[in-house]
């Protein structure tokens, strides 16, 4: 026996009410909680999938985890023990090199080296980071984890009938959010514009920032006119107006749109060389980082460096993780000391979520 053990359990998350996106309506989502134990210490991570968006084949997650568990049981974890001895209690101002070391360990374990299982790789990265902190779920210690700083976040408005969306908008405004993100593309575009017009009648751009996310719902043919129409509401940006893998069409939109465009789905599944090529071809105003969909913090951080080199803005978004994954993503986000609202969830979506020490007050996410 190596003294190293990987275990997991599937625990699908149940939505309090159906969650509508342009890809359909979700009532539950597949989730696995993983645990990595070595020499009496344990670390936890989460495999979080979004059906129709995540690359990881849902039906193969259990098999991949079983294969990895067998490999790890048979392996003498010399490298991991050395890593934990050298990095345990490390100064996380050097978090990039810590993540690089973890990436090397995951590569040696053959975890999604072909990019087919980014969410699974993220879960193992999380578990290794948690091991470093002694299993305290303090993936990245900072003034955020100490409760000294908070992260500005947007309030998310789910798709649905106009009355349901209006109800959500009023609730988020009452909670003190200074930035709202509306998912659009599921109902009639005129009705969505009427909703935006109604918000703007009451709140100026200085009082309330509005972002919209089309999840690729527009076509290259109708997108220019729709972007022009949306721009009259003085929006901050629109996420993924057309579906991914249409680089020339998206590049034309980014060059000519009166509204800033943020790429989201466009980042999923691209290898190292493709990432630079895509950013150079499309030249978006922003990119959005979702670690579960990109293979974890190491790869998401590489995207950020590429964006910064090109003068492209970014923000970080959770992707329907449980409170475990959300906490890790929030801690990583805090390292970048964001001043603009991030797209971090608040753990309120599910009937069976894990306990959390995070809370939102006045549009700021922090340790409660």
UniProtKB/Swiss-Prot annotation:
The active site is at 183 (proton donor), 290 (proton acceptor). Keywords: Lyase, Magnesium, Menaquinone biosynthesis, Metal-binding. Belongs to the mandelate racemase/muconate lactonizing enzyme family. MenC type 1 subfamily. It catalyses: (1R,6R)-6-hydroxy-2-succinyl-cyclohexa-2,4-diene-1-carboxylate = 2-succinylbenzoate + H2O. Its cofactor is a divalent metal cation. Converts 2-succinyl-6-hydroxy-2,4-cyclohexadiene-1-carboxylate (SHCHC) to 2-succinylbenzoate (OSB). Does not show N-succinylamino acid racemase (NSAR) activity with N-succinyl-L-phenylglycine as substrate. One of its GO terms (molecular function) is metal ion binding. InterPro entries: Enolase-like_C_sf, Enolase-like_N, Enolase_C-like, Mandel_Rmase/mucon_lact_enz_CS, Mandelate_racemase_C. It comes from Desulfotalea psychrophila (strain LSv54 / DSM 12343). PANTHER family: O-SUCCINYLBENZOATE SYNTHASE, O-SUCCINYLBENZOATE SYNTHASE-RELATED. This is o-succinylbenzoate synthase. PROSITE patterns: MR_MLE_2. The lineage of its organism: Bacteria, Pseudomonadati, Thermodesulfobacteriota, Desulfobulbia, Desulfobulbales. One of its GO terms (biological process) is phylloquinone biosynthetic process. Its EC number is 4.2.1.113. It is an enzyme of class 4 (lyase). Monomer. Pathway: Quinol/quinone metabolism; 1,4-dihydroxy-2-naphthoate biosynthesis; 1,4-dihydroxy-2-naphthoate from chorismate: step 4/7; Cofactor biosynthesis; phylloquinone biosynthesis.
């Amino acid at each position: 026996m190596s003294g190293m053990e990987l275990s997991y359990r599937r625990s699908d998350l149940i939505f309090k009410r159906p969650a509508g996106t342009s890809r359909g309506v979700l009532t539950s989502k597949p989730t696995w909680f993983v645990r990595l134990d070595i020499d009496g210490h344990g670390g936890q991570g989460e495999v979080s999938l979004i059906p129709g968006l995540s690359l990881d084949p849902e039906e193969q997650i259990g098999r991949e985890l079983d294969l990895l568990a067998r490999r790890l049981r048979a392996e003498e974890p010399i490298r991991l023990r050395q890593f934990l001895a050298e990095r345990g209690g490390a100064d996380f101002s050097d978090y990039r090199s810590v993540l690089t070391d973890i990436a090397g360990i995951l590569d040696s374990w053959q975890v999604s080296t072909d990019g087919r299982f980014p969410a699974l790789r993220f879960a193992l990265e999380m578990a290794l980071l948690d091991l470093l902190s002694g299993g305290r779920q303090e993936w990245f210690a900072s003034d955020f984890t100490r409760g000294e700083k908070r992260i500005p976040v947007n309030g998310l408005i789910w798709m649905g009938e106009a009355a349901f969306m209006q109800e959500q908008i009023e609730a988020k405004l009452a909670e003190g959010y200074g930035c709202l993100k509306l998912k659009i593309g599921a109902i009639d575009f005129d009705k969505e514009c009427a909703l935006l017009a109604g918000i703007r009648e009451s709140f100026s751009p200085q009082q309330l920032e509005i972002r919209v996310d089309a999840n690729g719902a527009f076509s290259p043919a109708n997108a220019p006119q729709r972007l022009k129409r949306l721009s009259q509401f003085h929006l901050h940006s629109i996420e993924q107006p057309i579906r991914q893998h249409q680089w020339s069409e998206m590049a034309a939109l980014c060059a000519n749109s009166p509204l800033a465009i943020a790429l989201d789905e466009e980042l999923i599944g691209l290898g190292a060389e493709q990432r630079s090529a895509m950013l150079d071809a499309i030249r978006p105003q922003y990119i959005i980082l979702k670690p579960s969909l990109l293979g974890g913090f190491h790869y998401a951080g590489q995207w950020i460096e590429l964006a910064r080199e090109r003068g492209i803005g970014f923000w970080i978004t959770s992707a329907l993780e449980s409170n475990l994954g959300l906490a890790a993503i929030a801690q990583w986000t805090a390292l970048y000391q964001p001043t603009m609202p991030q797209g971090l969830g608040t753990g309120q979506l599910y009937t069976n979520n894990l306990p959390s020490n995070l809370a939102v007050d006045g549009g700021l996410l922090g340790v409660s």
